[in-house]
Amino acid sequence: MIKYVLISALLVVAVYSFTIEDNEDALLEEAEDELDTEEERRMALPPGAVCIGHKSDCQCFGAKYKCSCPFLWRFRRSAKCHCRKGWAWTAIKKRSCHNRYQWSG
């Protein structure tokens, strides 16, 4: 019985430590996103330009343009993401962009 209690306690501690680590990573990502918003406000890439795949679609100019990456682009060095025309959902999603004033009419 005591073995089961100890194993359960160790399992809880392990899960808790992973949760704390994930929370720290999330806080770091939020801090980076806050820094990136200033950059997004200043610039918007034209259609067809090379964009950064792990950032938001707000970096591409236009309501319907999004950063589109090829399949498994993270594992291929030569693969680059480009600003390409998306669907209507892209325009709805980009309403919350900080630099939307650049392309909205």
From Swiss-Prot:
Expression (tissue specificity): Expressed by the venom gland.
Cystine residue pairs: C51-C67, C58-C97, C60-C83, C69-C81
InterPro entries: Toxin_34
Entry's localization field: Secreted
Keyword Ubl conjugation listed: no
Propeptide position ranges: 18-41
Function: Insecticidal to house crickets. It induces an excitatory slow-onset impact that leads to irreversible spastic paralysis. It also modifies human voltage-gated potassium channel Kv1.5/KCNA5. Most likely, it binds to the voltage-sensing domain of the channel, suggesting it does not block the pore but prevents its opening at physiological membrane potentials. The recombinant peptide binds to the channel in an irreversible manner and slows down the hKv1.5 current activation kinetics. It is not toxic to mice, when intracranially injected (at 0.5 ug/g mouse).
Name used for this protein in its record: U2-lycotoxin-Ls1e
Source species taxonomy: Eukaryota, Metazoa, Ecdysozoa, Arthropoda, Chelicerata
